[in-house]
């Protein structure tokens, strides 16, 4: 279950801190502090708009929370609703490093 939670809150519904130097890849400059990398967000107009509104402070439907792998692996999700939270990682490198350094979190038996 922990690996499933990790995948959900990262690869499906993850955000990464925006870097201004990547704006030249866009048609329009990013005006929020985050980039979307989660496929569940990218594939959903409603999820995308929810993040934009929450990031701009025009909605409080969901929380945007700093990445914490220990919290993520213990946090369940509802796949049939707009997410109530999104975790923001500093960089993709930080995500991969945290996974490698915390492999023991996924070997829990019980």
Q: What are these model-derived regions, one by one?
A:
Residues 1-109:
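Core of folded catalytic or high-affinity ligand/protein-binding domains
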């Amino acid at each position: 279950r922990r690996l499933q939670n990790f995948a959900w809150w990262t690869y499906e519904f993850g955000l990464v801190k925006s870097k201004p130097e990547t704006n030249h890849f866009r048609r329009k400059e990013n005006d929020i502090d985050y980039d979307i990398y989660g496929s569940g967000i990218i594939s959903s107009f409603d999820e995308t708009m929810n993040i934009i509104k929450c990031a701009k402070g025009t909605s409080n439907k969901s929380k945007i929370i700093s990445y914490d792998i220990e919290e993520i692996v213990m946090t369940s999700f509802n796949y049939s609703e707009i997410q109530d939270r999104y975790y923001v990682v500093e960089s993709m490198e930080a995500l991969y490093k945290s996974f490698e350094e915390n492999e023991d979190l996924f070997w829990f038996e019980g």
